[in-house]
A protein has these predicted regions:
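Juxta-kinase regulatory segment immediately upstream of eukaryotic protein kinase catalytic domains
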Residues: 9-43
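Broad phosphate/nucleotide-binding scaffolds in NTP-utilizing and phosphate-metabolizing enzymes
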Residues: 10-24, 56-68, 72-84, 101, ...
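An alpha-helical support segment within catalytic cores of ATP-dependent transferases
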Residues: 29-37, 164-167, 183-226
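ATP-binding glycine-rich phosphate-binding loop
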Residues: 42-58
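Active-site acidic catalytic loop and adjacent metal/ATP-binding pocket
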Residues: 53-64, 69, 104, 209-228
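A conserved alpha-helical element in kinase catalytic cores
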Residues: 72-123, 140, 145-149
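A glycine-centered beta->alpha junction motif in the catalytic cores
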Residues: 110, 122, 126-140, 183-191
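A cross-family kinase active-site recognition segment
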Residues: 140-197, 219-221
Length: 228
């Protein structure tokens, strides 16, 4: 069993920001996006930035009250994977009788995704979906039996919708994708200066290589991280 690691600095202070682009959110301003919304979608909206882990999200509201979410993807997200996400939304909406699923609002050309360039030259994909108001599950109470049954049913329906997507999950190179662990760790292990910690990492990687890697091609690969 690997003992707990005490809190200490393992990487240089600016390491994450400067070397791991998939963890960097886009940095578009409201001033950048308001004219872009009108140009691409023909909409005149006010914008308010929303929380986001790897993507940049904005609440977009028209004067007539119609509300949307403008999503700017991380520069590492591929068009193929985002198209699969849209496909999953559409299939889920068809199967969920009582569910509310965000619907994509196409641009003037009828496209669900538009390419945009940031000031630093990075390419991002932009899409607009209708906003769905609601309460986060963590803030909703009580979690009654009926509520949990409905939640489980919804998760099962979404799983069924994803199973109907004809293709295999697109290949990704995110840090937390286990099928990329070998190349990821080989790239970033030189930054680990603590010899004891480095030993644990190498031993874990060796164990993975000997026991899991030979079986990977036989295992099913999911579309999502299962962190619902």
């Amino acid at each position: 069993m690997i003992p707990p690691i005490k809190h200490k600095t393992i990487f240089p202070a600016n390491y994450m920001k400067n070397t791991i682009p998939e963890l960097e959110r886009p940095a578009f301003s409201v001033q950048d996006l308001i004219p872009l919304l009108e140009e691409r979608y023909g909409l005149c909206c006010t914008l308010e930035e929303l929380p986001g882990e790897r993507d940049q999200n904005f609440l977009a509201q028209e004067k007539n009250g119609e509300t949307y979410v403008l999503k700017i993807s991380n520069s590492c997200e591929t068009l193929e994977f985002l198209q699969v996400q849209n496909d999953g939304l559409e299939r889920s909406a068809k199967l969920l009788k009582n569910g509310r699923v965000p619907k994509v609002f196409p641009n003037k050309n009828g496209e669900s995704l538009s390419s945009v360039m940031s000031e630093d030259g990075g390419q991002h994909w932009m899409r607009l979906v209708y906003y769905i108001d609601g309460i986060p599950m963590a803030e909703y109470s009580p979690h009654t039996r009926d509520f949990l049954l409905e939640l489980g049913s919804m998760c099962g329906t979404v799983t069924k919708a994803l199973h109907e997507i004809p293709d295999s999950p697109p290949s990704r190179t995110l840090l937390w994708e286990m099928h990329n662990v070998q190349e990821t760790m080989e790239e970033y292990m030189p930054w680990i200066k603590d010899k004891k910690l480095l030993g644990w990492v190498k031993n874990s990687l060796d164990l993975y290589s000997r026991t899991i890697e030979p079986l990977e091609s036989k295992l099913r690969r999911g579309w999502i991280h299962n962190d619902f």
